[in-house]
Amino acid sequence: MHDHEITHLSEYDRRKFLQIAGLATGIGLLSSLAETPASAALPAAKLPGFSAFAKSVKVYKGEKYYLVESDGIPAHQMMVGIKSWQQQVPTVQPYSGTNAWSIPITPVIATNPISAKGHFLRGAIAIAVNGVPIFNALNNRGDDALLAGELDNWGGHCGRADDYHYHVAPTHLQSVIGTKAPIAYALDGFPIYGEKEPDGKKVVGLDSFNGHFDSKKNYHYHATKTYPYINGGFKGVVTEVEGQVDPQA
């Protein structure tokens, strides 16, 4: 579990935070049990974008996957600007050890890519470079979470497990990492860039998954201001189990 400052919760009713202290303690115990750090057996890895958040996000290289460890708490404020009813409060998550996020080291283009419409309405579809998971732009009812007013000023909110996650592209991270590095990685292994190409050029020719091939025939996704906002499914090979990508953290 990585250190984080209590100022992250300065916008919330601290009395409610104390009410869930028992839950947070339980999560901490689970974290300590699950946290057989990847660093104990695996070498550290460098993936573009993550290095700017090295104090709170660790990346390791396994046989088939990069493993991303974080506590799921971003440096920015949370839950401010939500227009719909939201009772959850963000708490530290045990994304470490066997619960680390898995990103394929060698992404493979799928023979039959899967759209996010009607699929992957549970769990994450990508991981942002600040260690926060990104869910489908559609909530578990199939509605656009942004248009429904469910998201805060940073494009995120909490799930029922008090896990903070985004539903749209966290382009605000470019104020930290710049525009040349990915802002996230889809769980099929392909990188996700901002609304422009890394060289600053206008993005053209996106497919229905919000991605395309570059001049070197490498595939990547882009953020957009309109749906699907982030990767609209998976151009690469993934396994779907009970409506979500497997493995999850």
Where are these regions (language model features)?
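Long, compositionally biased interface segments
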Residues: 209-249
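Short, recurring structural edge motifs at helix starts
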Residues: 149-156, 205-211
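Extracellular structured ligand-interaction cores
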Residues: 98-100, 122-124, 151, 161-165, ...
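N-terminal secretory signal peptides
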Residues: 1-16, 20-31, 39
